[in-house]
């Protein structure tokens, strides 16, 4: 189930908190981490000084009001950038607070060295301690079940109310502190010290108190800093050039021009985009260990998918009853029903349901005096011995052949053909027997999840290769792979095959994603560029992965890849828009500033703004308000459609590149007209 944790972006608490943090973040010790906006803040301080002490900055008394306006607009620009980041952080803090409420101090039943039980606080537990949990107990700490089996309510962590079964010795042996034991009794070995639990790590991650920038974000910041330095040099050289041609440019105008030219839009939104990307993953109940993991998901070239539970439901369900040896379909259906009346497995229930849908009906007293024959690994058959002496069985082809041989019966000529046909279709054949006679075959089909073929088609359009991993024989694997639409499959796979496939793909320069839940998956999860572990799996798997799915839904790897691509697209789209904005603003305001002194420049003044002062103020106002206008896109992400990289590039250039060129001309002109009509400037 792909369920989102819904926390409103624009709730009163989050917005008020973001406004407060916007002022707190004005501290230069914090602002220097965002070099572009730090330059704007320094510029704000200089124009403030020019407003208070105009003579020291060569300003005339008439320019004090203008300097004050420039200072105010620059100040608001910095606040808007801080607000965008604080708003994104606010969502994470709200989610962290929700999780923190689930972390309660509980009492634990600690098993001491002599075997006695001592009641202690959960905060006193250490790694390696053994605790007992019974029905109704809150599990005091993360650990591994070493004895017993129990139903666990994990709704405090996952939000999912249905209990899950956890037991010792398997891939579903790990338990999380804060969850509740619904039934039975288990013995748990604590695997973490206080403050290092899975819930503690979740809180730190979603709160983002010490969010590390991803490599792509660092690289983009380096580019933005380089552009900022270039424009600082450009503006600094403009002053002596203007003086040479007898054009006077004030300090406030120089700073305003610099702020309009440097990439303030993406500089103000960059952190918000990264935080929001992590948040979008969290809303799908997936915890990413770093922003790097989310970004890596966006660059994935290959996805490894387990067949069972990911591509198929994993429950083989009855699809048909096929008669052999001249028997009728009705006869096979009836005895298939009889053989499964006491079979409580999903397969057995599906046989009963299908038989009844096809009109078969068992007598009300059929089970009276009947002996139930349970399925076992040795016999690989199950059924009933009826009170009238009739023996009814269903089982695997090989074991039924042995059984019929022992009973002195014969195998129908068409049985091999029907069994092979079912195997080629990717199904599992179960042969139905009455006494020493084969009646027919039950076709069990591992049903492919709805929509998987379409999703694989979308992944293929994005240039992502899909590889199905299965323990099935090659014929069955090939059939399911073709039906599902995966690009490649690995049949009869062993645990080491996964890591070998990952290394093979990585050797070809491809980034690989995979899901896993068992201890034997841990090496492959660690090797993969994106490893998504199931929360229901072992602690080893969760520690090896760089993402954990709280819903334990392996198909969610496809959503994670989509979110990663959306993050990269959003950053790229807004960067394109920002740089296109800067180019447009340059041609919009620079000619307006110097055309009065140099009439030859008027040919470049396509905007025909009312005055040089209005040109500067209009550009600054546009530069400030474009940040909050784009906050919803930064938070939500640009609309993502599966397509090739070239198609995405052309689409973004058209929408955000061309849009970034046009928007400043329209916006600045409108603001200029408003200023002129209101103030008569």
Curated annotation (Swiss-Prot):
Belongs to the cation transport ATPase (P-type) (TC 3.A.3) family. Type IA subfamily. Its EC number is 7.2.2.6. The system is composed of three essential subunits: KdpA, KdpB and KdpC. The gene is kdpB. Signal peptide: none annotated. It comes from Caldanaerobacter subterraneus subsp. tengcongensis (strain DSM 15242 / JCM 11007 / NBRC 100824 / MB4). HAMAP family: KdpB (MF_00285). Mg(2+) binds at residues 517, 521. The chain crosses the membrane at residues 37-57, 64-84, 218-238, 255-275, 573-595, 615-635, 655-675. CDD domains: P-type_ATPase_K. It is an enzyme of class 7 (translocase). It is a multi-pass membrane protein. It is found in: Cell membrane. This is Potassium-transporting ATPase ATP-binding subunit. It comes from the Bacteria. It catalyses: K(+)(out) + ATP + H2O = K(+)(in) + ADP + phosphate + H(+). Gene3D superfamilies: Calcium-transporting ATPase, cytoplasmic domain N, Calcium-transporting ATPase, cytoplasmic transduction domain A, HAD superfamily/HAD-like. The active site is at residue 306. Keywords: ATP-binding, Cell membrane, Ion transport, Magnesium, Membrane, Metal-binding, Nucleotide-binding, Phosphoprotein, Potassium, Potassium transport, Translocase, Transmembrane, Transmembrane helix, Transport. GO terms for cellular component: plasma membrane. ATP binds at residues 343, 347, 375-382, 394. GO terms for molecular function: ATP binding; ATP hydrolysis activity; magnesium ion binding; P-type potassium transmembrane transporter activity. The lineage of its organism: Bacteria, Bacillati, Bacillota, Clostridia, Thermoanaerobacterales. Its main location: membrane. Part of the high-affinity ATP-driven potassium transport (or Kdp) system, which catalyzes the hydrolysis of ATP coupled with the electrogenic transport of potassium into the cytoplasm. This subunit is responsible for energy coupling to the transport system and for the release of the potassium ions to the cytoplasm.
């Amino acid at each position: 189930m792909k369920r989102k944790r819904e926390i409103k972006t624009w709730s009163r608490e989050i917005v008020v908190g973001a406004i407060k943090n916007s002022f707190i973040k004005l501290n230069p010790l914090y602002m220097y981490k965002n070099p572009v906006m730090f330059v704007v803040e320094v510029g704000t301080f200089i124009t403030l000084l020019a407003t208070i002490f105009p003579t020291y900055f060569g300003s005339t008394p008439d320019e004090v009001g203008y300097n004050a306006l420039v200072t105010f607009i620059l100040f608001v620009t910095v606040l808007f950038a801080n607000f965008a980041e604080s708003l994104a952080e606010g969502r994470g803090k709200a989610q962290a607070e929700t999780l923190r409420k689930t972390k309660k101090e509980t009492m634990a039943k600690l098993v001491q060295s002599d075997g006695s039980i001592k009641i202690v606080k959960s905060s006193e537990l250490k790694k390696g301690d053994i605790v007992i949990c019974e029905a109704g107990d809150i599990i005091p700490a993360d650990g591994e079940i070493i004895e017993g089996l129990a139903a666990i309510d994990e709704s405090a962590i996952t939000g999912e109310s249905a209990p899950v079964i956890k037991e010792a010795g398997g891939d579903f042996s790990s338990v999380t502190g804060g969850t509740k034991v619904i039934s039975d009794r288990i013995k748990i070995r604590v695997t973490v010290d206080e403050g290092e639990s899975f819930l503690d790590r979740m809180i730190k991650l979603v709160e983002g108190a010490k969010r590390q920038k991803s490599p792509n974000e660092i690289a983009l910041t380096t580019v933005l800093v380089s552009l900022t330095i270039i424009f600082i040099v450009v503006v600094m050289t403009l002053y002596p050039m203007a003086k040479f041609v007898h054009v006077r440019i004030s300090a406030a105008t120089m700073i305003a021009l610099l702020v309009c030219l440097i990439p303030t839009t993406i500089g103000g939104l960059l952190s918000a985009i990264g935080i929001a990307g992590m948040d979008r993953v969290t809303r799908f109940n997936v915890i990413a260990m770093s922003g790097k993991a989310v970004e890596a998901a966006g660059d994935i070239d290959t996805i490894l998918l387990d067949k069972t539970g990911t591509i198929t439901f994993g429950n083989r369900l009855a699809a048909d009853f096929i008669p052999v040896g001249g028997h009728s379909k009705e006869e096979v259906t009836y005895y298939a029903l009889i053989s499964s009346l006491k079979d409580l497995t999903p397969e057995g229930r599906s046989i009963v349901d299908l038989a009844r849908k096809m009109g078969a009906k068992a007598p009300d007293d059929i089970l009276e005096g009947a002996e139930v024959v349970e399925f076992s690994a040795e016999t690989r058959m199950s059924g009933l011995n009826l009170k009238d002496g009739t023996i009814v069985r269903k089982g695997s082809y090989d074991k039924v052949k042995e059984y019929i041989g022992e009973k002195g019966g014969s195998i129908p000529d068409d049985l091999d053909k029907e069994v092979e046909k079912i195997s080629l279709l990717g199904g599992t054949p179960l042969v139905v027997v009455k006494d020493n006679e084969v009646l027919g075959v039950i076709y069990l089909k591992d049903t492919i999840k709805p929509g998987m073929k379409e999703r694989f088609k979308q992944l293929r359009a994005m240039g992502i290769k899909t590889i199905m991993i299965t323990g099935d024989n090659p014929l069955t694997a090939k059939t399911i792979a073709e039906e599902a639409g995966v690009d490649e499959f690995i049949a009869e796979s062993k645990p080491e095959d996964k890591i070998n496939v990952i290394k093979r793909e990585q050797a070809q320069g491809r980034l690989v994603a995979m899901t896993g839940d068992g201890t034997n998956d841990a090496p492959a999860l660690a090797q993969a560029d994106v490893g998504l572990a199931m929360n229901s799996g072992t602690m080893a798997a969760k520690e090896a992965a760089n993402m954990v799915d709280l819903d334990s839904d392996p198909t969610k790897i496809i959503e994670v890849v989509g979110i990663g691509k959306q993050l990269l697209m959003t950053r790229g789209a807004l960067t394109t828009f920002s740089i296109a904005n800067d180019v447009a603003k340059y041609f919009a305001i620079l000619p307006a500033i110097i055309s009065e002194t140099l009439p030859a420049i008027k040919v470049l003044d396509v905007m025909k703004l009312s005055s040089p002062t209005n040109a500067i103020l209009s550009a600054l106002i546009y530069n400030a308000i474009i940040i909050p206008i784009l906050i919803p896109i930064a938070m939500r992400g640009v609309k993502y459609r599966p397509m090739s990289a070239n198609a995405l590039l052309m689409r973004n250039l058209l929408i955000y590149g061309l849009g970034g060129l046009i928007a400043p001309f329209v916006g600045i002109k409108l603001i200029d007209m408003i200023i002129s009509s209101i103030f008569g400037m």
